[in-house]
Amino acid sequence: KYLKTGFATPSGKVELYSETLEDLGFDPLPYYREAAGTNEEYPLRMFIGLPDDEYFRTGMRHVPELRKRVPDQTFFMSPNDAERLRIVDGQWTRLTTKVGSVFGRVFVRSSMPDGLVRVPHGWWKPESKKGLENMSGMWDFCDARITTDDDPELLDLEQGIPHMKGVPCSVEKISETEIARLEKAYGPTNELKRGPEGKVLRSDAKPNDFMFDEFTGDGIEFEAIELSLYGRNTI
């Protein structure tokens, strides 16, 4: 196709140096930007955008069997971070960024690196109250509530797309009063199902053979996409 039509660039070729970006006042070459730094108020970094393994984006939360496996929004966290924050597995917490906060239950996994929190995408509870005031739990659980929208340190300057990784955040335990409010609105807190710890493929162990699928044990390098594929492993 592209041998005949060329690419959708002024030259019709692959352009590593973009004259279009240059005309708009941006750097015409790819460049690296340091992630926004953490601080005392927001000592952790979160990444969002990946759904729970059991669901498809924002969908399928009405399926009883899937909700038995993952009944609530969960925050994936390393054992060291959980111990430092005095949070136990399955405990209700609040995750806060500079733009907002959501509730979720901590899911301690040895494959998570220290300092990083994974927040699954698109949480809501279709069985709960609807309407603008409640939005079926979206105001309490959805990652859209904590995604920055105007911080230049956390935006793709060329397109205005918010960063989904490396966003400074904090996680803290919530009070019994707050837990009671959540349970009144959304039902009792049920046990979080736990499957065996998923094994993650070391990036430095990958040979050129794309069929290679040998996995290693704990304490290995973390890669976000591999956590999405293998992290919870409840089946």
Regions found by a protein language model. Give the residues of each.
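Long, contiguous, secondary-structure-rich segments that constitute the structural scaffold
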Residues: 62-76, 80-235
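Long, low-complexity segments enriched in small/aliphatic residues
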Residues: 1-65, 214-215
